[in-house]
Amino acid sequence: MDEKFETIEELCVLSDALFCKVNPVQVLGGQVFFDSIPAHEAAALLSNTQKRYQNSSLLECENVVDSIIHRMCDRDALRMRTSKLGQIHVFELLSDLIDAILLQQNGEVLCRYTHILHWRNLVQSVGEELPMTAMYAVKDLEWGQPPRERFAWDYVVRQNNEPLNQLLRRGISDHHMHLWASAPYFQVSWLNLMNGIANSPYLRNCARIDREDWSLERDWSLDGGQSPAQAARRGGSLVSLCQQAALIRVYLCARLKGLPLRLVGDKTDNLRFVMDLLHNPELLQMEIDHIQAEISSLRDPDGEFCMDYALRFFGPRDNRDPYQVFSGERWFLYSVLRDIFMTYHVLSRNEQNLFYAYLLLQIQIRVRMVQTDSKVGLDHFQKIQRRKWYFLGDPRSQELIMRLAVCEPLRRVPHLLELEVRVIPGDTAEQLRRNIAQLEHAVGGGGRPELPDGNDAENLLGRYYYVLHFTREADRAELSGFSRYGFEYRHYKFRKKLAKKGYAIQLFRERWPSLARRVRGIDVCSLEIGCRPEHFACVFRMLGAHSFGTDEFGAPRPLPRLRKTYHVGEDFLDLADGLRAVSEAVNFLNLDCGDRLGHALALCMDPWEWYQGKNRQISLPMQDYLDNVAWLHYMIRRRPFPGIEQALSFLESQFEYYFRRVYLNNINEAETERFVQSGESRYSEREFARNYKAHRCLFTMEDYIRAWMLRGDHPELYRSGYFWMDESLPDERLRFQVNEKLLADTSIRYIPECSFLNFSYHYNLQIRRTGAEYVTITVKDEYIRSVEAAQTALQFDIADRGLSVESNPTSNVKISSYAEHPITRLYNNGLVHTPDELRGCPQIPVSINTDDSGVFFTSLESEYAVIARSLETLRGTDGQPRYYRWEIYDWLDRIRKMGNDQSFQFDG
């Protein structure tokens, strides 16, 4: 690695340690000061908390810290400062780091493209606001500028690679963007918390987080410290942390502006009283109403609403700019940092140390609201991500989020051609109408003078549309009891809810066709584990075929078809399980040419690396493992693979063992015979079912996979133990209960073994109980070869169907690295040039998107940039770059065009 890059990496890691791992209690108690952290304690912190140094000795960490201190001393002349050997000044450390990563160009702070990956890591740990305000403070002082009064910059910094920027200016589209996670919700939440610290709903939700059974495994002090859960037990609850931060903030703001702050009646020694409150949570709680009154007096002195009292402390405000709302916090950070970097200070050293404690408190609170750790798993991510609703419940915050997530990106980035905004549908047509109308109202400005005017909103209208995404739920059915068969099929209540939502969407489209034209697609998101694509099959087929509404006179009016996309293959316990989920989504939901798959990581991850990363051990429900074995056998038999015979034999032996455990041990032969005889009797007058004959059922692997194909049908059709359609039901309802597209031979439904196995899968409680038991499997080479072959077959099947994959680099980087992002295994045209390399790749149309840009502190342009830079850093075995820059840009340009072409608006 280049020495300069190594140095910046060390600065990033040490900054993470000093801003994220130091216990604020030690700072408030005076044991730690921002400008004199001993080198040996910083080294111990590196050794104890940083993955980069987990295999390094304490002496090696001390050498790293000493080298950083010496480099800081070497820069003293440039920065007009005097660094001390053996000690670290955390803000001077930060200034040296940002000076290497950022630059100022035409008055705007940009990220140096060559260091965009370092910047991404820094932002992930401390956020953008601190380093950005530090950069502006440093540069303004360097150029002798007076204190700035404008702080309304974008919350995602741009980079300075002009050739790449020129490529992106040709037009880009974001077709995978969740609305409420695509704005800086922590920043908005923080303002709500800092302005309402006494008996507010936001504080009550902090207490709710404290009550939740969740803790984060990390150290918070220089000497080993405590986890947040341990801090809570010692009185450091999230409520207390927020109140401490709010007290420090209002005190320092008043000091910076020379305003009287009446915290102690007529006394003037506010600092001592503030320190007493910070050291005594009980006393702080007693005074909290008084402190809130001071905040309120600063916030609304003239009765006019202001989201943040700090906005009152500097220059003219431009209320038309939604980024203005963050200016108060930025002014506060900038002003204190500027004071710290100046020779003559307004704040005392103790007060400046309070600012360091404020930052530590803020970051400690942030890790409870935003995923900043490296823990893998969609369940962990969603547990934290859903907390945004705790702090954004008021209408003003929701309107602000809509403007920040949709309006501003479209207004500020003219080459952002299109946004696909994903929202959760309501339970009724009226709820859905109201929700969409409110979102449209927010974009249109609602007639408020500070919001976009009508012409502006009209121009934006054609550049975004909505996709309704259903959310998954686990099956909570009660499987206890002595009866072998139950009356409810799998996910019974959840399927009923889905059907209700589906009919509501139909009714919404029929009653309000003009507004319904703003909705162009449907999707499914959230945890995959425990909720398979089969549960969404009927509602997807129904909505995908819906095409007519009515006008104001009751006449039929054609509507654009609802296109389909589906989050799949993103979260799984077995790579084979993720691949099977992709196959089920395609086949059961009838995804067709032009439809999309969201994430689909299972399609493009290296099976050998994935299983090795799991130490060749997988743990999953027995039913899922049995399904995976049968599906793998089916997939690799469809497409010839050389040398796969041994793998087939292995799968057959696994199937025989687990099929007996899950099914045969829980099926009564006499009962089975009665079901089959009942079917024969009922079918006696049905010509199309003449092949259905009662006989002793001998179940084979072929029967099992055929029964798996029937899972795309509605389970109600198999309630009797065989397939039966109630002809008294209207055709419109029956039409979508049967999956017509998967089966080339519909007579499979009338094979007793197949229909009975599907019936047993849904209604046999003993099978469901046994199948739900977890098994731990040691993965053998034959299994991995099977997965590898099935993955290849599925990749080319997806390509042949004309489906596309929505890639979200930062969202999925915890699964892989940027450089080895699996998108290149789906599409490599432009990166490679030999016929074998090109034909060996399925060349599936892919796109680059943001997913949850507010969660991952990214933008669409930044997503392209991190992928480009990561590919540039790859080296071949000879040490030379694996790809030329022109190859990378050619490949990205092709992806850019494909992303634009994947719009759901093209149906008219």
Report the location of each language-model feature:
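Metal-cofactor-binding active-site regions of metalloenzymes
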Residues: M1-G908
